[in-house]
């Protein structure tokens, strides 16, 4: 089980990494489960790349099962029901409140053997997930980026501070 997380403002670089990594991982480890949070950005691209490569994928939601947030990800969520599923600790009617996202990240990190941070600014939920993964003694990886890119600051710091191993491909991950 791996989780792929990152910024909600994914760049083409991050989107392409998700697509290429999961395409290659599907060949090397066809039974791997991909977990993320169904959010904008890296999360949704990870789910969609998993589906495109026939990998099971699970979204951990920050609200009840009676809604999909963001609503524009409803089709992907429905597709995931046949190839993974949706998971939440929140009761029906629970709203996607800010504190629920941090709680959701705890489950994402806890159910995964490895966390992969694809892109992250200096602050964000994906860095919280990486910190939680470290606390759970899980493997953590980060995709390096250009030092001038805001969306790479968090990943580069994780690597620099030895909080995550540098990852460039599925082959070296396996």
Q: Where in the sequence are the language-model features?
A:
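Glycine-biased, small-residue-rich flexible motifs in mid-sequence functional cores and linkers
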Residues: 1-174
């Amino acid at each position: 089980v791996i989780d792929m997380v990152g910024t909600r403002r994914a760049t083409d670089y991050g989107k392409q990494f998700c697509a290429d990594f999961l395409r290659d991982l599907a060949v090397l480890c066809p039974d791997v489960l991909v977990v993320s949070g169904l959010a904008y950005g890296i999360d949704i691209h990870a789910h969609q790349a998993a589906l495109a490569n026939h990998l099971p994928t699970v979204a951990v939601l920050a609200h009840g099962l009676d809604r999909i947030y963001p609503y524009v990800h409803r089709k992907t969520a429905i597709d995931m029901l046949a190839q993974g599923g949706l998971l939440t600790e929140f009761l029906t009617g629970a709203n996607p409140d800010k504190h629920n996202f941090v709680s959701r990240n705890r489950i994402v990190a806890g159910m995964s053997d490895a966390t992969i941070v694809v892109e992250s600014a200096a602050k964000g939920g994906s860095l919280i997930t990486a910190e939680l993964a470290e606390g759970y003694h899980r493997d953590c990886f980060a995709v390096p980026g250009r030092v001038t890119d805001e969306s790479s600051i968090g990943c580069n710091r994780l690597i620099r501070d030895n909080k995550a191993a540098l990852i460039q491909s599925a082959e070296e991950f396996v």
